[in-house]
Amino acid sequence: MLAAGHPQREAFLAGLHIERLVLNDAGAVLSGAALDRIGLYVGETPTFNTLDEARAMVRSRLVTFGAHTQDQWDFLTDAVLRSTEDGRWRLHYDPAIAAPFKAALLALNGPTPDADLWPLYDAIACPTLLLRGAESDLLPRSVAEDMTQRGPKATLVEFAGVGHAPTLLNEDQMGPILSFLAEA
């Protein structure tokens, strides 16, 4: 959706053909309060003495992802952790990813407003599957329902017991995606 709003959109999209689109708990309006929540920790670079300590912190941030087995939690957390030369643990991502986000928050000088992406969503022209965690704070239910009536008129699938965002590790989450993509 962001490409649709880029100044060089036509050049970017030339020759690009998307047959089917899956949106995972991201919609035409993103909750400003949820963006504020994410802004509290994006860009942080904590280090941890043990892998268990690092896993516990990451898991506490991902609690909205819903129920998972211990192996699934280890998979999710280990993917974002790396050991350091001194035997400690750190998050594995570029903290500079937060710079534009934090600059935008500072420029607002107050609560973050909802991000209105309706013009971008309405420009989507392919069949679209919209996945939503039933307790998502980023994608309000009313927006998800509106997305089934506008633009590509997405097919909405919600997952109980999940917030932002479904991890797509469980069969009940993968099944709808596989079925949707098989329709192509």
Language-model segments: residues:
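Active-site-adjacent alpha-helix of alpha/beta-hydrolase-fold enzymes
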Residues: 145-154
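Active-site loop/turn elements of alpha/beta-hydrolase fold enzymes
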Residues: 23-26, 135, 159-161
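A generic "structured core" feature
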Residues: 163, 176-180
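Conserved serine/cysteine hydrolase catalytic core
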Residues: 84-146
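Hydrolases whose catalytic domains are alpha/beta-hydrolase-1, hotdog thioesterase
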Residues: 1-6, 10
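Flexible "cap/lid" loop of the alpha/beta hydrolase fold
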Residues: 12, 16-53
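Conserved alpha/beta-hydrolase catalytic His-Asp/Glu region
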Residues: 49-104
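Catalytic histidine-centered segment of alpha/beta-hydrolase-like enzymes
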Residues: 162-171
